[in-house]
């Protein structure tokens, strides 16, 4: 126990603390607060979930810090964007793939010069959509995904479940996509500009995609703002990590 007292303990929450063994109850979370030197969350949403029903005394603890995921920041020529709607993620109902498919098949029937790219797989669920411009690419490397985002005009992340953060929408925003997301969990924290679906269904998604296709000025405005206002890049997050490390070893926090 003496050796343990000399060490610094940090816990990182990448998912909803209230659904993870060891942090469900108030007692468990108070133990974590008292035992750990730092508690890192990947979004404001996961932080708030951890603090649910805890006394105000703990709300502003210096032990608690949000450090989001990040990606590279690059120059994107919006004039080179293709008429592509892209979906990246597990092809299951939790990710809203069925909602996306129903909406986009209707879009492709109405707008003959647009196509959809689908990146991902899901061996546990079989949700299939067939259209010659509904192109399933399967699993791709992260570099490939970033390049696909770079040439896509519209990206959709329409999860049903409360995403703790949401990497695909973050990366789509960084590459200048007009991003449509569901208002679930930490997804709204992944974009600075875009469309947030407060009512998630295929009809609403269809309408928002159609609006972006028809209104080119609106689409390009969102794309431009996504690029210009994007700040969750590797450099920024690395600086936050440096501050956290210095704080961890320079002083005791509570």
Regions picked out by a protein language model, each given a short descriptive name:
Residues 150-164, 177:
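Acidic donor-binding loop of glycosyltransferase active sites
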């Amino acid at each position: 126990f003496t050796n343990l007292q000399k060490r610094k303990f940090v816990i990182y929450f990448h998912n909803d603390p209230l659904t993870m063994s060891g942090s469900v109850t108030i007692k468990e979370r108070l133990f974590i607060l008292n035992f750990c030197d730092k508690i890192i969350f990947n979004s404001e949403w996961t932080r708030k979930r951890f603090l649910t029903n805890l006394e105000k005394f703990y709300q502003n603890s210096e032990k608690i810090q949000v450090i989001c995921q990040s990606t590279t920041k690059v120059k994107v020529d919006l004039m080179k964007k293709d008429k592509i709607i892209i979906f990246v993620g597990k092809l299951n109902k939790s990710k809203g793939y069925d909602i996306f498919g129903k909406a986009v098949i209707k879009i492709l029937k109405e707008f003959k010069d647009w196509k959809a790219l689908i990146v991902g797989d899901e061996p546990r669920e079989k949700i299939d959509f067939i259209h010659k411009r509904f192109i399933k690419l399967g699993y791709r490397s992260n570099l490939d995904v970033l390049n696909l985002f770079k040439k896509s005009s519209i990206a959709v992340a329409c999860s049903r479940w409360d995403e703790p953060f949401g990497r695909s929408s973050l990366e789509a925003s960084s590459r200048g996509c007009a991003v449509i997301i569901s208002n679930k969990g930490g997804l709204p924290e992944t974009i600075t500009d875009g469309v947030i679906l407060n009512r998630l269904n295929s009809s609403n998604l269809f309408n928002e995609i159609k609006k972006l296709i028809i209104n080119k000025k609106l689409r390009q405005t969102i794309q431009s703002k996504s690029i210009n206002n994007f700040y969750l890049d590797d450099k920024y997050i690395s600086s936050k990590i440096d501050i956290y490390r210095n704080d961890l070893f320079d002083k005791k926090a509570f």
